[in-house]
Amino acid sequence: MAPRGRKRKAEAAVVAVAEKREKLANGGEGMEEATVVIEHCTSURVYGRNAAALSQALRLEAPELPVKVNPTKPRRGSFEVTLLRPDGSSAELWTGIKKGPPRKLKFPEPQEVVEELKKYLS
């Protein structure tokens, strides 16, 4: 039997993902204002409903602040809210990745995130 060759597709995929993240990070440097990013898993509708409710609450409290939902492909089981600042830094307002089961522990109350956002903006 012939020797098996090394798989090169996995290495290329890792490099492509790293380049994509770097490009997104560099693209974020030119922002003029802060942005709220909500990343949620797409495997279940519960994540989407909670993300929609949270984005609506954020838009009501800070209408001048843009809110993006899943700008990139989300991680499995994730629910994160991040504030991207104009200087390129980011502040995590909520992460539910390590929380649960039960799944409801992954989702914050919208008011908690709004209060956290106000702390970072002031």
UniProtKB/Swiss-Prot annotation:
Q: Give the gene that encodes this protein.
A: SELENOH
Alphabetical list of Pfam families matching this protein? Rdx (PF10262)
Record PANTHER family = SELENOPROTEIN H
Cross-link Cysteinyl-selenocysteine (Cys-Sec) per UniProt, renumbered positions? C41-U44
Question: Which domain of life does this protein belong to?
Answer: Eukaryota
> What keywords are assigned to this protein?
Acetylation, Redox-active center, Selenocysteine
Write down what this protein is called. Answer: Selenoprotein H
Q: Which GO terms describe its molecular function?
A: RNA binding
